[in-house]
Amino acid sequence: MGLLEGFTFLDLSHRLPGPLAGNLLGGLGARVIKVEDKFYQDPFNDGLFSKMDNAFKDWYKGLNNKKEILKLDFSDQEDRRSLEALVQTSDGIIMGLPSKVRHKLKLTNEDLEDLKKPIAVIELKASKSRKNFMHELNALALTGLLKLYVNGRNEDFISPPFLPFSGIAFGQKVGMDLLAGVLKSKKEGKSSTYTLGKKKKNKLN
C-alpha cells in the first residue's frame, strides 16, 4: 500500500516540471490522471520537441509511467463533462492550462471555488517578474546566457543544455507544494490555489 493510496490528482500540465510532480505522487500510490487535449497533446510526445528529437518521447514515457493517460476533445461537451466529473473526485490539480482554456473548461479559480469542496491547485506560471521557479531555457534566455551558448555556432539545430536540473528541482517543489495544499484545504474545508508556491487566497462559504 502506497502512502498516498486513496488520493486522486489531475495532471493538466505538459513538458517536465508538472508531469514529474504528478509521477512522484503516483509513485507514492496516488491515482494520477494526466489529461491532455487529443488535438494539442504534450509536445514531449506529439509536437515540436518530439519531432526534433526522439529522446523527448522517452522523457514523456518516464515522466508519466505512474499515471493514467486520458486524451479528450476539449471542444466536445461530453468530454468536458467527463473532465468535470474527474475534478469533482480529485484532491488536487497540477494546472498548466492557459487562462483561455481554463475558462472554456470551467476550471478557473472561481469555478473551482464553486465546487464547495477541499481541493488544492498548483498553477505553473513563469514570467520576468517571477523568477523563483522557471524552466532552464527561460532562465538562460532572461539572463542572456542562452545567446552566449549559441554564439558562433552554425548548426541547423542546436541541442539545449542538458540535464535540466532546474526543471527537475521545480517538479519536486510542485509536488511538495501540492501535498501541502491538499493537507491545508482538507483541514480548512476550502479550495486553495497556489501559483509557483505562493498562495492566492480563495474564500468559500
Predicted regions and their residues:
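N-terminal helix-loop segment corresponding to the beta1-alpha1 unit
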Residues: 1-194, 198-205
